[in-house]
């Protein structure tokens, strides 16, 4: 049964969950998972529900907040005030020492945001019972002013759902697994692989290094959280066939972990396979098409060979096409914004799904689980994209324009009035304060602090009318045309 919220900020209880909404009135009702009650399942899409199941994230309780409105005499701060925006404070029973817990907020416009237990927890925090409670402080998005293009208020009032999820964090053999949880999962499920594609798809045989070094080869390198079969799935079969023929069958996809190890480590593994499989003195000449973080792997192969063990072999990166690559980093990889990175990918994969979206979302959810345990270490692959981090600081210390480099980047703007896409774009624009594809800044694809990395005549800027996001580049006809122009 629904209970009334207290706009004065007092806690109310529903189904064992304490909820305070200072400045906001409305109703709250807990929905526990039970046979025959499908309300909890209806709060997220089938794709997200499947990904949660695959990641072993189980619903502890959903709390529906409905008929929300600004409280008449509420004490919560409002938009533009001296304090922060209004918040929901939820105190949820701990699932126990062997379990982790995280909260997924589902807004009325469908936007999904992850929230983690507050760091200043204590037993019985704010509660009336002796139970251990975990506290969540969830900022509420307030009405957004129009941006000059007729946009109205977004994501405020109406209905929100607090979806509380739990997961196992103890391993019978290894003990507490929260530390480096994502890296351990990635090592088991998303480790390295190399294969030569066929003319009809991205599947293929193991690499024959003798054949690969018989002429120029094309190397496809995927981006963050992804695999080659997902990242390049939008390339039409006839386009893959054309590339296969143009390179004499020497087209290779490079699967690699993107969360737990940095791009140089990825490049080092590739070179180790080359050195082990090719004869002494062999030369490998490659053109690279790299998406997202994969571009940093391509640059490691081209620019950081002093850190690679070529063992008497020679690697020549003849050209590289960067597609949505954070050469100057992305604010989403700043430790303060890792939550925003996970939110962005969760929404992108849900609202604009592609082949393998559930598999990609699984990787995202493993990082969500790790952050929920309070551990941010062991994410070197993500931290390599931090604009102020050590990895990019060293890589971009003396950037020089490279004639063989080319870049494609986009500034996303939704072409529909879909509320969720509008909300995603608004959030990204507030974070980046510059043109972006929701994940990386456009200009950072070809320049570092206004110093060019890619020649001006080898850049493609996709305008916002095409609504290209970070995950949809290869479905764009403009991108496919440009790849044909730049590649043999």
Residue ranges and their predicted role:
Residues 1-253, 275-277, 468, 477-488:
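Flexible, membrane-associating and regulatory peripheral segments of lipid-active enzymes
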Residues 149-178, 303-488:
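Helical cap/lid subdomain of alpha/beta-hydrolase-fold lipid enzymes
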Residues 216-217, 285-287, 319:
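Structural motif
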Residues 230-234, 264-267, 300-303, 334-335:
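Short coil/turn segments at secondary-structure boundaries
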Residues 240-244, 277-281, 305-313:
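Alpha-helix termini
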Residues 250-258, 376-377, 465:
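Glycine- and acidic
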Residues 261-284:
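Helix-loop module immediately N-terminal to the HCX5R catalytic loop
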Residues 289-294, 298:
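Gly/Ala-rich beta-loop-alpha elbow adjacent to hydrolase catalytic centers
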């Amino acid at each position: 049964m629904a209970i009334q919220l207290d706009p004065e900020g007092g806690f109310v209880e529903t189904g064992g969950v304490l909820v305070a909404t200072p400045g906001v009135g409305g109703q709250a009702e807990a929905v526990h998972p039970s046979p025959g009650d499908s309300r909890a399942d209806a709060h997220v899409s089938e794709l997200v529900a499947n990904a949660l199941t695959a990641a072993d994230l189980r619903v502890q309780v959903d709390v529906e907040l409905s008929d929300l409105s600004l409280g008449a005499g509420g004490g919560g701060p409002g938009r533009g005030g001296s304090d922060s925006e209004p918040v929901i404070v939820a105190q949820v029973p701990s699932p126990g020492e062997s379990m982790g817990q995280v909260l997924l907020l589902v807004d009325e416009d469908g936007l999904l945001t992850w929230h983690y237990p507050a760091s200043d927890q204590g037993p019985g925090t704010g509660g009336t019972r002796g139970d251990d409670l975990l506290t969540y402080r969830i900022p509420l998005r307030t009405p957004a002013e129009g941006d000059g293009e007729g946009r109205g208020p977004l994501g405020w009032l109406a209905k929100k759902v607090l979806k509380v999820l739990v997961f196992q964090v103890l391993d019978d053999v290894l003990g507490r697994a929260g530390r480096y949880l994502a890296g351990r999962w990635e090592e088991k499920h998303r480790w390295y692989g190399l294969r030569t594609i066929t003319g009809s798809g991205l599947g293929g045989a193991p690499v024959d290094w003798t054949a690969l070094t018989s002429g120029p080869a094309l190397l496809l390198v995927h981006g963050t959280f992804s695999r080659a079969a997902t990242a390049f799935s939008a390339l039409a079969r006839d386009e893959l066939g054309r590339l296969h023929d143009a390179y004499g069958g020497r087209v290779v996809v490079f699967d690699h972990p993107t969360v737990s190890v940095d791009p140089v480590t990825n490049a080092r593994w590739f070179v180790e396979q080359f050195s082990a499989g090719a004869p002494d003195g062999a030369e490998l000449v490659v053109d690279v098409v790299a998406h997202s973080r994969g571009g940093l792997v391509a640059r490691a192969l081209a620019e950081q060979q002093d850190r690679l063990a070529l063992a008497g072999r020679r690697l020549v990166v003849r050209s590289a096409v960067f597609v949505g690559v954070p050469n100057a980093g992305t604010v989403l990889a700043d430790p303060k914004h890792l939550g925003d990175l996970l939110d962005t990918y969760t929404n992108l994969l849900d609202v604009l799904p592609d082949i393998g979206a559930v598999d990609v979302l699984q990787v995202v959810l493993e990082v969500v689980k790790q952050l929920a345990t309070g551990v941010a270490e062991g994410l070197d692959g993500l931290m390599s994209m931090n604009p102020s981090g050590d990895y990019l600081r060293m890589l971009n210390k003396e950037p020089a324009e490279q004639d063989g480099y080319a870049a494609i980047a986009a500034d996303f703007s939704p072409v529909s009035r879909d509320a969720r896409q509008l909300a995603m774009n608004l959030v990204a624009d507030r974070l980046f304060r510059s043109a972006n594809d929701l994940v990386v800044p456009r200009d950072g694809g070809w320049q570092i602090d206004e110093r060019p990395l890619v020649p001006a005549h080898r850049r493609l800027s996709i305008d916002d009318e095409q609504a290209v996001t970070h995950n949809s580049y290869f479905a764009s006809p403009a991108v496919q045309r440009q790849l044909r122009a730049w590649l043999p």
